[in-house]
Amino acid sequence: MFVHLTRKPNQLKILIAVLLIAASASAETRGNLDFSKIRIKNFGQTSEAYYRGAQPESRDYPALAGIGVKTVIDLTRDGRADEQGLVEHAGMRFYRIPLTTSERPSEAAIAQFLSLVNNPANQPVFVHCQGGRHRTGVMTALYRMTNDGWDANHAYEEMRQYHFEGFPAHPVLKQFVFDYYTKLDQTRQANNRQDEKAVGASK
């Protein structure tokens, strides 16, 4: 809608009021989502754009769509054969990134995962594996360290809150999280040094 700014100030005031009310209603809706129909084990909300949990049952997909989820990402290697159909029938997108609980995620898997979860068209996403603990815990830790600036200790603490078992059960995955953060931190520091040099050279 076009509003002439100089000749119709009353319309402008009305438009601003409508926009403010709409923004307030949207924020209130996001803050008061109804999770009562979610029965997924180990379910949690990492951010407004990211949910996590265990393998959903058939009844859970409409419930996920009901809280606004647009994309389901399955991290299991041999997930349920009918999951894609159930997800798409509920109006959501489906992706599978096959991971194991005994091997580090590949660079290709990490790149695909971060691309999917950071694409606004896919958000909010729901990320799951079988129990929502190990593969989901690791990939959510990468999300936290990459997007939220968390260090490895902070990310691992959250993994434990969702029942991740590091030693002796899954030492490879735990070590991977700490190694990933070390590499990420080194890259950030190198980029900061390059930025500082560029600023100094421009003066």
Model-flagged regions — what are they?
Residues 2, 23-126, 138-203:
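Cys-dependent protein tyrosine phosphatase-like superfamily
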Residues 2-15:
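Bacterial N-terminal signal peptides that target proteins for export
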Residues 13-23:
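Bacterial N-terminal signal peptides
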Residues 129:
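Short cysteine clusters
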Residues 132:
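Substrate/cofactor-recognition hotspot
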Residues 135:
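Glycine/aspartate-rich loop-and-adjacent alpha/beta segment that forms the canonical ThDP
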